[in-house]
């Protein structure tokens, strides 16, 4: 079955209670239309004020650190690039971090961890968090949610932490870790002890949806908590999902895909006694043959035998959207992590898409093999669109929506309970495009379905709101035409099907303007790094000890030359004395 995200008529649903894992009615809408799981009804900074991050400094006015030092804020970014921090950054309660507003290739936080310790009601979207080995503490996590509750993390890349990429532990019932969702995120390349995620809290709740755990020795995740683990993928792990504990917890482990990479050697699923487990539809691929052709997998018990449930312990598993394991692989490799990809994530996704041929467990940033910026790669800055009243919404969006570009009206409540700036950041956080009214605009559906490109995808379009949608003769271009005299938000649905019986259904959100499109803004196709990235030239070593190859983002070997390749992003791989070195190459 296909899965649909973000249908606006289905935005409001019941909230999840914090006790007895039940549900209660909610007057507020979801954190954002695609929000799922225990953290779905977090409100973040809704109703507070807007804070602009205006520089890449470690601290001071306009810095990210200052932005999250007080609660009741929606944080937007007027700059893109890398923020190097010297110490941990503490995020306060009642905050929305809208990383999708950053121009260019977005924002990356390097040099230290982010922490939500003892805080609550937080939304974090489109943020790259990469401490590296020179962080202030060798035991730093990337994102630490200790003693936190009611947090949702979406479309983030959490990598290169010396302890765990994700931390979320508590031994205190007064500050239990609960009401957490992590979705659509990339959790990769932990260094030091090389652990993916350590989650531990008695009576806590945690949901994982559509995430990728990549190049990680162990704890992918280690969940000593009541959890829902649905439609995630693991690649190149030595130990996968684990629950090594004597304390009783409930686990729903459904339709996940586990694929061995060069380091893979253990069963994916390690359970102990005293655990209650519902496991269904999970797949494992051990053959490293470059194809997604795994087999059904059952529970592997590490110490003792737990209770195997006949149905899910939590209703989220039965009521939420769900893909088959293979379709989840295709979706996650199409849209998870921070979009557009920067150099590090381009390398990680290339390794994933080789399906067993590439990838390594790394001990340092340099071990990844990137040859740009001392191994860190680059994150292109870009330029923010004009925002005359500094309310966080650019003028082009306010004009399209009929708002006042000379008045700070960001927190004015709109339909379905969202405030106006949430309308903007929710549009920007989805697959989206812009169009002038009464003018057709084409959208290349391949740009948001990369994971399906190896299985001869077939597309269909339907359910246009405030306009019409047609699939063009090439089979992948969707042409949207808005209604006459309409401006504001429109949308259409698309479905992609692979020849391996995989399928996904999603929506593209369309902003229809009254006048010509403001060229200073980037839509989801123009934000794609394969189009916007300008790379420096580089020289390949040419001696007998060096093996060179050019690969596309799906891991396919293309030869030794880029001369006849079409426009796009490629990986150049050099094997020098047994060590892989990489360069992200973009052909304009």
Feature-to-residue mapping (PLM):
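Extracellular calcium-associated, cysteine-rich motifs in secreted modular proteins
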Residues: 370-432
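Acidic Gly/Asp/Thr-rich repetitive segments characteristic of extracellular carbohydrate-active
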Residues: 30-75, 553-559
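A short beta-strand micro-motif common to beta-rich folds, especially ectodomain repeats
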Residues: 486-500
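C-terminal tail/sorting-segment detector
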Residues: 503, 507, 517-521, 569-588
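Right-handed parallel beta-helix
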Residues: 94, 99, 120-131, 147-163, ...
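Extracellular beta-rich repeat passengers
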Residues: 222-370
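Extracellular beta-strand-rich solenoid/capping regions of secreted or surface-exposed proteins
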Residues: 65-71, 82-98, 105-125, 131-148
């Amino acid at each position: 079955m296909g899965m649909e995200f973000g249908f606006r008529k289905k935005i409001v649903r019941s909230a999840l209670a914090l006790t007895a894992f039940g549900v209660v009615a909610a007057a507020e809408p979801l954190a954002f239309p695609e929000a799922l799981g225990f953290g779905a009804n977090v409100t973040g900074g809704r109703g507070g004020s807007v804070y602009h991050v205006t520089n890449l400094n470690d601290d001071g006015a306009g810095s990210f650190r200052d932005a999250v030092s007080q609660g009741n804020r929606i944080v937007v970014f007027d700059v893109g690039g890398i923020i190097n921090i010297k110490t941990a950054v503490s995020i306060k309660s009642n905050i929305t971090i809208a990383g999708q507003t950053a121009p260019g290739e977005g924002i990356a936080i390097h040099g230290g961890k982010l922490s939500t310790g003892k805080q609550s009601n937080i939304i974090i979207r489109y943020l790259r968090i990469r401490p590296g080995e020179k962080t202030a503490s060798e035991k730093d996590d990337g994102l630490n949610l200790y003693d936190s509750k009611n947090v949702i993390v979406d479309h983030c890349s959490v990598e290169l932490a010396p302890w765990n990429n994700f931390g979320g532990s508590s031994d205190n019932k007064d500050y239990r870790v609960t009401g957490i969702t992590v979705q659509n995120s990339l959790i990769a390349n932990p260094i030091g002890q090389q652990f993916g995620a350590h989650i531990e809290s008695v009576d806590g709740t945690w949901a994982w949806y559509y995430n990728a755990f990549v190049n990680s020795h162990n704890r992918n995740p280690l969940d000593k908590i009541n959890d829902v683990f649905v439609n995630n993928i693991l690649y190149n792990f030595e130990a996968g999902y684990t629950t090594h504990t004597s304390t009783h917890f409930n686990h729903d482990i459904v339709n996940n895909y586990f694929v061995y990479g060069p380091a893979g050697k253990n069963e994916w699923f390690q359970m102990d006694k005293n655990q209650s487990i519902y496991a269904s539809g999970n797949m494992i691929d051990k053959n490293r043959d470059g194809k997604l052709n795994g087999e059904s997998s059952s529970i592997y018990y590490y110490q003792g035998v737990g209770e195997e449930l006949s149905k899910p312990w939590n209703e989220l598993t039965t009521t939420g959207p769900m893909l088959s394991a293979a379709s989840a692989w295709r979706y996650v490799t199409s849209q998870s992590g921070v979009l557009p990809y920067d150099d590090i994530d381009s390398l990680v996704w290339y390794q994933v898409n080789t399906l067993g041929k590439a990838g390594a467990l790394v001990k340092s940033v340099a071990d990844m093999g990137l040859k740009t910026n001392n191994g860190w790669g680059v994150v292109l800055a870009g330029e923010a669109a004009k925002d005359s009243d500094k309310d966080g919404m650019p003028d082009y969006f306010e004009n399209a929506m009929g708002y006042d570009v000379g008045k700070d009206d960001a927190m004015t409540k709109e339909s379905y309970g969202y405030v106006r700036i949430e309308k903007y950041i929710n549009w920007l956080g989805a697959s989206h495009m812009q169009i002038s009214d009464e003018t057709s605009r084409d959208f290349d559906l391949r740009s948001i379905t990369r994971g399906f490109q190896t299985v001869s995808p077939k597309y269909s379009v339907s359910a246009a709101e405030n306009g019409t949608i047609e699939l063009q003769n090439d089979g992948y271009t969707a042409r949207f035409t808005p209604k006459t005299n309409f401006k504001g938000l429109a949308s259409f649905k698309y479905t992609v099907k692979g020849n391996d019986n995989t399928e996904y259904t999603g929506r593209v959100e369309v902003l229809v303007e009254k006048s010509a499109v403001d060229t200073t803004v980037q839509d989801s196709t123009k934000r794609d790094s394969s189009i916007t990235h300008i790379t420096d030239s580089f020289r390949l070593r040419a001696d007998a000890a060096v093996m060179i190859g050019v690969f596309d983002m799906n891991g396919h070997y293309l030869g030794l030359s880029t001369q006849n390749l079409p426009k796009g992003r490629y990986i150049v791989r050099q094997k020098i004395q047994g060590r892989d070195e990489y360069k992200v190459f973009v052909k304009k």
